[in-house]
């Protein structure tokens, strides 16, 4: 078996607010196994709805392949505040255990309870201050990582790269703070 573990994948449950993915959880997991991965994390876009289905399927897999790991996570949208016309940075959280999953549920509930419409789309951001509070409350039970090019780190790297391409580093100091 391969030692590669996919820690960022989406299922059809990511479509709760936008059309993003057509993968059924079972099919995604089966494909990961067929590819020889050692595990996969389900990290839908601010949605934990697939987790019950995934857990049920994971239990059936344990009998045939106890070494294959399925992790439950969430791709949240990080912001400093809840104002319109801002960037909603993608950020991955993965539960290490049941306590970590409780933290995911708590953060998701806060985000959905404070959702609002911005640019004709329902937004469900997690404030950085809320993330910090929950991470401290459930210290050691979550894995956190940048998500994709839509994450804050990816965005900053791209912006810095653009400054380098046009040989104009006057704005680059913003990225080194």
List each model region and its residues.
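Phosphodiester-processing cores and adjacent nucleic acid-binding clamps
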Residues: 1-177
């Amino acid at each position: 078996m391969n030692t590669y573990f996919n820690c960022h994948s989406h299922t059809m449950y990511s479509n709760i607010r936008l059309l993003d993915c057509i993968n059924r959880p079972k099919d995604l997991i089966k494909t990961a196994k067929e590819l020889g991965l050692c595990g996969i994390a389900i990290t839908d876009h601010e949605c934990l709805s697939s987790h019950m289905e995934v857990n049920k399927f994971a239990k059936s897999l344990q009998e045939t392949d106890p070494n294959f790991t399925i992790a439950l996570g969430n791709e949240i949208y990080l912001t400093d505040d809840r104002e319109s016309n801002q960037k909603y940075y993608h950020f991955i959280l993965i539960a290490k255990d049941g306590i970590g999953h409780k933290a995911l549920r708590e953060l998701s509930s806060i985000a959905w309870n404070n959702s609002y419409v911005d640019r004709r789309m329902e937004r469900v951001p997690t404030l950085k201050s809320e993330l910090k509070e929950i991470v401290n409350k459930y210290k050691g039970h979550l894995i956190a990582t940048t998500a994709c090019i839509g994450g804050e780190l990816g965005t900053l790297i791209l912006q810095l790269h653009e400054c380098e391409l046009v040989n104009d580093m006057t704005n680059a100091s913003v990225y080194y703070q």
